[in-house]
């Protein structure tokens, strides 16, 4: 027993030694191969240079060299002096004109930056990409700065790869090399040195043969455990095992990963569920900024399950022609029954969703007898869980049940809502391709019972064929989302009282949380009110239109009902330091046409991008400055301060470097994030600091995002340089900006 315990303790240590030994050997081989490649490329380039040089020499020998004309006098050239070049040899004296260049003042130093027109969220940098050069003076004053800077990044510096760098290629080679060892060799340390040397020679002799052949069996778990212990930042043993499988799988050329769906326009298109067809669109589409793969919101909000209150254009349901499906017996009753079912079906609240991969079973091809996902609303094609249904005695259903990409439940309430009346004419036997069936399932969630519109979009099927295909799949297609039943209108006096109470609540919240502004994340707690457990309430934020709470939520901001310009505290949006929302503020002009230049609402400039023309030129105060081209009035919007959105921790790390440079572009956005315009930004980043500024900065909530607006503090004339208060302390202001601009009479 003692011997067994000793051996079990020695096993992991032995495997760690093997990992280290093989890793160092592979690294050395990689360096040798790299050196050989460099030598080979150097020799090849040198040979090409010699060949090219020889060709040029031959060309120069064949050319006629024309002598240079020698000037004898430059007296005819004004503003020049004569310069003579003499030689002790028999060469004639050469005379050339000498032109004097006047001294020109150098432009201020400018560090490289990338222009942006909107904020760009970036991840924290956990590795120091480069050690900044501060100059000898800074290092002499603070010799420990570089050491402290590296400690802030936990000692991780880009390029420091000693015994810590392992890429996919080395990882696969390392696992294959360790696969040569047997599990019974854990007690190698107990052998004599001569026996260990003989074993090592045998491994080296047969290593080339074993590495050239594919492994006979999957590597032992001990190998991945040992690698994980040596490289803990690369993942656990199970993660390394899965990574090895992915890297070593032999896939056919052009084969798609299991979670991918073939192109619907390609020859390999399959009949799949609506959720699978729209997976990429649902995953990449951001419903806050209406862009695909946006760079501002890392977590995409779940689409709202409630319909908008504005009216929608009704589709034309007249027959499209003499062969329209509506001429069939029972067709109109079938469509009317679908509409009635939609009205009486209660809406289902969705769950939250983040970016992710498809479920493993969703990659299998589906058949026409598969449950399509439940549509949630008409305002957006949302993704929902595809659901297979309950009990079905049909033999064909049982045979194809394993092929479904759906999971559980709602088919018990998604069975055929009505029984189809038998048609006089028999249905056409038309074959549907995978692309057509997939496209039908996508469109049915938007157009529902308008089969004429679906047929026009598909293009290869008539509305009658689409109708018959819909009848065939009626037992497995989920019903359309329920239409909201309008609540009875409140009395006018009660509505005004609620609105006044709401405005007072805005003022109280503004006064109580002026120093605590947190980033907004939409709340998503289905069937629960926004109480003390709601994330919006906890962060002291209003519920926005992106939240999943009810439209009657007491914490939801309803917008304003102003008739004027929304530039005084009489406007609830202006009072709450928000821009008017075009989806909520329908009377002030914020919802006017986007291309309209004359907008009555003056509280929507940031979201519309109504910035002024700015000019960049050297400043009389410090470095570069920004100047206004056209005059602006007091409180008029000038520009948005854009840059990288970074966390507070990342801002602290970057700020220590910026303080040494005595140049910082950090701007607090809220308690969670900071805008850094050092690397990326717009021209307003060059506006200098002043204790008597002509501009002021204001952080505003714009459609759920905090954004920084620069406004005129007074009337500014053409050509004036722009300044705003950086809110430095008195010592920092003298250290960073040593010159204060002269007072200007407004």
From Swiss-Prot:
Cross-link named Glycyl lysine isopeptide (Lys-Gly) (interchain with G-Cter in SUMO2), sites: 634
Entries under InterPro entries matching the protein: CXC_dom, EZH1/2-like, EZH1/2_MCSS, EZH1/EZH2, EZH2_SET, PRC2_HTH_1, Pre-SET_CXC, SANT/Myb
Subunit structure: Component of the PRC2/EED-EZH2 complex, which includes EED, EZH2, SUZ12, RBBP4 and RBBP7 and possibly AEBP2. The minimum components required for methyltransferase activity of the PRC2/EED-EZH2 complex are EED, EZH2 and SUZ12. The PRC2 complex may also interact with DNMT1, DNMT3A, DNMT3B and PHF1 via the EZH2 subunit and with SIRT1 via the SUZ12 subunit. Interacts with HDAC1 and HDAC2. Binds ATRX via the SET domain. Interacts with PRAME. Interacts with CDYL. Interacts with BMAL1, CLOCK and CRY1. Interacts with DNMT3L; the interaction is direct.
Lineage per the UniProt record: Eukaryota, Metazoa, Chordata, Craniata, Vertebrata
Entry-annotated residues carrying Phosphothreonine: 339, 345, 367, 487
Composition-biased stretches (Basic and acidic residues): 196-222, 374-385
Domain of life: Eukaryota
Region listing for Disordered, in residue ranges: 180-222, 340-426
Molecular function as annotated in GO: chromatin binding; histone H3K27 methyltransferase activity; histone H3K27 trimethyltransferase activity; promoter-specific chromatin binding
Sequence ranges assigned to domain CXC in this UniProt record: 503-605
PROSITE patterns reported in the protein's UniProt record: CXC, SET
Name this polypeptide is given: Histone-lysine N-methyltransferase EZH2
Keywords: Biological rhythms, Chromatin regulator, Glycoprotein, Isopeptide bond, Methyltransferase, Nucleus, Phosphoprotein, Repressor, S-adenosyl-L-methionine, Transcription, Transcription regulation, Transferase, Ubl conjugation
